[in-house]
């Protein structure tokens, strides 16, 4: 589920699709059903709202895709307040029209709360459409396993509800690189399994989250030596040092192991701070992340 892509058909033609369902059998996946790009397009809908209504970047440098910013806004809004205006742009068919955006744009320009309310409408609509689509396929093709991919799968507000929506699903997998960059993984896998007919690889031996560059102590020391006029450093072996620094309201960066693939930090690189400080969220957003005040953070929880 994404903004669109091309599927090659057995008759030699290509069809542009935005939502498709597949079933995994042994070492291959097989198409169940595809949806034409002009019928349902949640990905394009988010792109249009991100750029046309909120004036944010839909992709590319320097900001990349800022749909995640809109998703963060949605948690502070009333999804019903501007539903009548939302319905003018998004008809009953889940596809964005090329209609008049001016009313929504004026609201966003004049009042910050309106941004949150419009974002909440967008998120609620997304939840409804995706829930119906996935539910339809699970009803027709019952399965205890569900795998999601495509840029829309980055919408964690929506995906976080899936286990509640479908309690019959026992296993949910969302690749850490579900958007276009994941083609670098999907292409070789397709050849490996479909073309060369190699067997499946057990999930525990096939995690794709940590495929980035790994920095070793020698290379770290080399960089520190290069920048010794600007950076002071001290080697510490006591783990309590991090806790003491956080207690004094310092912001700590930590990393270890290979860098994560995808757009979410998954533990190998993290920013740590004391959540008890009432000003810490604003400090990190303003001075470290350089982003809007409402952007949220994920807690780190020790098992």
Model-derived segments and spans:
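Flexible beta->alpha loop and helix N-cap segments adjacent to enzyme active/binding sites
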Residues: 1-91, 135, 145, 154-155, ...
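Active-site cores of enzymes that catalyze phosphoryl transfer or operate on phosphate-rich substrates
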Residues: 70-124
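Phosphate/ATP-binding catalytic cores across multiple sugar-kinase/actin-like superfamilies
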Residues: 120-144
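A generic structural signal for ordered alpha-helices
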Residues: 27, 108, 112-115, 140, ...
